[in-house]
Curated annotation (Swiss-Prot):
Modified residues (N5-methylglutamine): 152
Organism: Pelagibacter ubique (strain HTCC1062)
Biased composition (Low complexity): 139-149
Record PANTHER family: 50S RIBOSOMAL PROTEIN L3, LARGE RIBOSOMAL SUBUNIT PROTEIN UL3C
Subunit structure: Part of the 50S ribosomal subunit. Forms a cluster with proteins L14 and L19.
Role according to the record: One of the primary rRNA binding proteins, it binds directly near the 3'-end of the 23S rRNA, where it nucleates assembly of the 50S subunit.
Keywords recorded for this protein, A-Z: Methylation, Ribonucleoprotein, Ribosomal protein, RNA-binding, rRNA-binding
Sample GO molecular function, one term: structural constituent of ribosome
UniProt-listed InterPro entries: Ribosomal_uL3, Ribosomal_uL3_bac/org-type, Ribosomal_uL3_CS, Transl_B-barrel_sf
Disulfide bonds: none
Family: Belongs to the universal ribosomal protein uL3 family.
Annotated protein name in UniProt: Large ribosomal subunit protein uL3
GO cellular component: cytosolic large ribosomal subunit
Length: 236
């Protein structure tokens, strides 16, 4: 089940207190259950995958093609469809639903969401440029990004040049975010730290791709308490 992901909506941020006195900033995500719409076999497309549906949508907003798909699968319409490559398709059956339980044994996750849009921004705000001098002959262009090219050779502005432009509203992935706790009854997921996006931003959550040997906060607290119980051999 670690091959698939879930989609949720960002509720906001709060904080979690521990008995050791430590305070941890937490992002709360309202997760949605995923339904298996169809299972894709290797014989048909050359790879194994599972297609999951998320959210609710009115049938009047669907295209004829999507209406035909849901009618063929005899399932209710879903707002979004996501396809995930899997190694074994026997674990998934059409119509089955998955929720937060797929993260029961997972410590760290990756999240993908869209950043907050900032509109048109200058080079100093967008790329953290220092700007030009405040005095000594500089006029009007104090917050300018400066030169954008060379001379006759190469005679052009290279692609990727950092300049003023639209800031934010980009899809970004955060890796190795620690799961603080899960509330399966209310379908809430608590992750350590901040996640890009405003309230109600859709967030894709999946098991971390990178394997890291890192202790969670709960494991650190348990290890510290265990160390207090064991007598120190140096002290006599």
């Amino acid at each position: 089940m670690s091959e698939i992901a879930l989609i949720g909506k960002k509720i906001g941020m709060t904080r979690e207190f521990y008995k050791t006195g430590r305070l941890v900033p937490v992002t709360v995500i309202k997760m949605e259950k995923a339904r298996v719409i169809q299972v894709i076999e290797e014989e048909k497309r050359g790879y194994k995958a599972v297609q999951l549906g998320f959210g609710k949508i009115k049938a009047s907003k669907l295209t004829k093609a999507m209406k035909g798909l849901y009618a063929k699968k005899n399932t209710e319409a879903k707002k979004k469809l996501k396809e995930f490559r899997v190694k074994d398709t026997e674990l998934y059956k059409e119509g089955n639903e998955f929720g937060l339980e797929i993260f029961n044994e997972v410590k760290f996750v990756d999240t993908t969401s869209k950043t907050i849009g900032k509109g048109f921004a200058g080079a100093m705000k967008r790329h953290n440029f220092g700007g030009l001098r405040a005095t000594h002959g500089v006029s009007v262009s104090h917050r300018s990004h400066g030169s954008t090219g060379q001379r006759q050779d190469p005679g052009k502005v290279f692609k990727g040049k950092k300049m003023a432009g639209h800031m934010g509203d980009r899809v970004r992935t955060m890796q190795n975010l620690e799961i603080i706790k899960t509330d399966i009854e209310n379908e809430l997921l608590y992750l350590k730290g901040s996640i890009p996006g405003s309230k109600n931003t859709e967030i894709l959550v999946k098991k971390s791709v990178k394997v890291i040997n890192k202790m969670t906060i709960n494991e650190k607290i348990a290890a510290a308490e265990e160390a207090k119980k064991t007598p120190d051999k140096k002290k006599k």
